[in-house]
């Protein structure tokens, strides 16, 4: 079956924003205009097409990235709708990894908000080209120029408007296109019929100034045009579009559009901008990977190259079972064929291939380079795994996910719930790499850990709804960590003789702090003093030992371990003995390494009316918070600070009470830092160590 849409006419894009910027409504309008839905669902009515999980419809927020395929003016869009709540940044992270471009939606009244900064940073990490849609221009207090300025001020990004709104708030009626210097007025109906009008006289001067600034900014990305511009020649409209496109594709320049998705104004022009400025799979750099021999290699967006893809999301569908979402980077995949999971070394059969519209499924025969689809039948594939043609092995760059910062204990309500709970938790952990579950060895309780209170609320809710498991939930606890402050060298020896075959394991390991780099293992054993299989066993044993720190039993992080020596016994050596020996070496070394407890520190931004500014500053300081600065926004103040997570439980209620419900805050994980002695002593006391 031949490809229906060329690669040039394909766009893989994400819609990203702060919670409540109107992102899901914008996506709804896009799906309406691209012919995917025939009745628009409003988020505040709980009827949105993309928010298809029951919890999303109740809470009016987007939790999982629903992937959908849509069509616009002979172009195919694969759209990923991503969540705007900080507890779900993993969803944003994994979407950005497989996208070629994104639309960042801002609230026209607030401009750049804290979660916008987080998502923007993630997009910058993956060098994702972006265009910006300033939404809610009909809202009281909407200010387009302020919003554009906030992109430069708060994100340090080079942005310029390519549109100018006509009016604002209730008087927002249309848009001036600064590239073509045309003005449009909207009728406000769902079809978004735009009538071309004269540029209003009171905006003509401003539009001309903004256009000349746009031309000046855009020609920087095209040398030939720069020369033409400096020679005083006229830059044509196609040339200007080409220069803007170059700047966008390089993730260096960010054009800004205006509109109101809810009031049906400006979304069709946004779709045109996606085609004009965001890249096709051919415009972005080829994906890199590693061959079995360790050499670096690339895969290009080409149907004739060997098949390679990255699994970026796993979820359980009530009708078809396990669904694995994947992005094809090269080649073609046909349903019913076998693929190699090169990350795990497993061969798997792709039963069916589905293209998704929110949670509706269309079965397709083949999927091509540059496409996004979901596979049924992959049993062992998880997020971040590479899928390839088994004759052409490669492992593509994977994804890195943050550690959970909050945990709580779960107890099943009945015996029947207990039997189902284990299965439910393992399925949910398979879907979400930032969700962990384990059994506390001392209490026997089941512990779940995640990125925030809302994250864990939704996990518990999903267990009840999807798996019919009722649980009692304990109070949230902070996920502390441990680390070392000094280097040390230690020997670990495990020898057991009990008649017949014994056990023998012996290693010498050098440990040192590895700040912010996680666990690192280095093998410096020479001359075959310890065989490779026993060295690997020592590594596994050490990693297991690190999950239970010596200070208070919390996982130890940021440790570099170098195995430098050891010995073997011809008969008695076995893998288990080396696992135990490595754990002994760690225990011995910890006596000299000054192990300490780390606590999660959060970036906290509080926005309050001016009259509460002093109260909030005092309150944050009383929570061991470090105030980093404040910013005036209208008649409100935004205070930026870093506060230990343990001090932030119940803060929503606290803030509500002393600001009469007029304050709000956002909290995002920043880093782990050493806990003060008094706090550490309290933690150790509670742990019973």
Curated annotation (Swiss-Prot):
CDD domains noted in UniProt: EF-G, EFG_III, EFG_mtEFG1_IV, EFG_mtEFG_C, EFG_mtEFG_II
The protein's name: Elongation factor G
Location of the tr-type G domain: 8-282
Subcellular location: Cytoplasm
NCBIfam families from the UniProt entry: EF-G (TIGR00484), PRK12740.1-5 (NF009381), small_GTP (TIGR00231)
Lineage, opening ranks: Bacteria, Bacillati, Mycoplasmatota, Mollicutes, Entomoplasmatales
Range of residues in the leader sequence: none
Keywords: Cytoplasm, Elongation factor, GTP-binding, Nucleotide-binding, Protein biosynthesis
One Gene Ontology cellular component annotation held by this UniProt entry: cytoplasm
Organism: Mesoplasma florum (strain ATCC 33453 / NBRC 100688 / NCTC 11704 / L1) (Acholeplasma florum)
Gene this chain is encoded by: fusA
